Amino acid sequence: MWCPALAGLLLLLTACREAPPLPADRAIVILISIDGWRWDYLERFSPPTLSRLAAEGVRAEGLIPQFPSKTFPNHYTIVTGLTLAHHGIVSNNMQAPDIPGTFSMSNRDVQADPRWWGGDPIWNTAERQGKVAAAMFWPGSETKVGGRQATFWRDFDDDLPNHERVSQLIEWLKLPEGKRPSFLTLYFSDLDNAGHRWGPDSDQAREAALRVDRSVGELVAGVASAGLTDRVNYVIVSDHGMAALSRDRMIVVDDYLDPATADIVDWSPVLGLSPNDGDVEKMYAALKDKHPHLHVYRRDEIPAVYGLAGHPRVSPIVGIADEGWYITSRAETDRWLQHERNPPGGTHGYDARAKSMQGLFIAAGPRLRRGLVVKPFENIHLYNLMCAVIGIAPSKNDGNPAVIQDMLR
């Protein structure tokens, strides 16, 4: 016998049931990098937009980078799901026996050689499966990796104001169906710049964080004006955190060897050098165990935890500074004195297990869980998450789909 009260209860339960998740083929992912956002800034600085997105979506207590916890290697890990040894971008600055020139963040000509870039960045994964992708600044996006790029991309210009970066993304999102990207990237450098100059505990770092938060708010408003709120999923990350520096924690290379006798590819906090005369053992002996906060290794003897032992793009001699210590030269310290400048206030690149190196992870949108807080996890798993959100099959990677499964609706 049909009971009106039971019918009313069933109707109420149906109305209260959470709406079904958005189909993956209609989902859009916007991957936002806030360079240098440390794991604890969300609580310390209370940015309104990011705090709201974190509450409405999935938040991690920290995002663990790869070593060295530098910008280019970790940005490329995020979009490939590969460790540094597997995708090849082992540092911001490196050399390879089979590629001419020195790779650096400022050397666009050398960066353009596709032989540096391994793996399958997600914009290529998406495009190969019939989707459109757009990259508003991301390491690797300016190079044809595997013979292809995103449909839309921009040459990196750190002087481009944040509002123009956001405007470009909104312009792409307002394209008609079929031309509109399903995967987009966006990058902000304000906070990393402030952290390096003034340190992670400075007022300037807080101001930079809130400035970026306002830009993210502009993006969210633009997505709403484009009528895409119910389709857009935000994946907001940082490549690393930031550790404070001090004049009292300097390692001056000149105290142990003449810098002119070596090709120093990388400085701090991971020293990478090759002796000009080819005598690796002599230079290794000059540095080994000379400073209690500098750990020196031959390339083949780098501890397994760092995942880079024997890699041909790693310098023959590597020195790794302890967290908070800075490797420098007498020439650099003299310049600080001459111009009455302070040394850098902060840096990164340290052992990825250091808490100060952990970054930000927020994921919010119709394909993602609401109000979920997860323990810190490695950034190699982000590629699988983003592929799952937009419904594409991931290429081979080092992530574990089980790590991100509970984040999905």
Locate predicted features.
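Metal-dependent active-site segment of extracytoplasmic phospho-/sulfohydrolases and closely related
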Residues: 31, 49, 211-252
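Loop/turn elements at helix/coil->beta-strand transitions in domains of secreted/extracellular proteins
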Residues: 25-29, 56-60, 129-134, 178-184, ...
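Bacterial Sec signal peptide processing site at the extreme N-terminus
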Residues: 17-26
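Short, structured active-site-proximal loop/turn typified by the sulfatase FGly-forming signature C/S-X-P-X-R
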Residues: 40-87
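A long, amphipathic alpha-helix that forms part
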Residues: 22, 162-174, 191-232, 282, ...
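Active-site neighborhoods of enzymes that stabilize oxyanions during catalysis
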Residues: 265-373, 377-388
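His/Asp/Glu-rich, glycine-adjacent segments
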Residues: 82-199
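C-terminal motif of bacterial Sec signal peptides marking the signal peptidase cleavage site
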Residues: 13-15
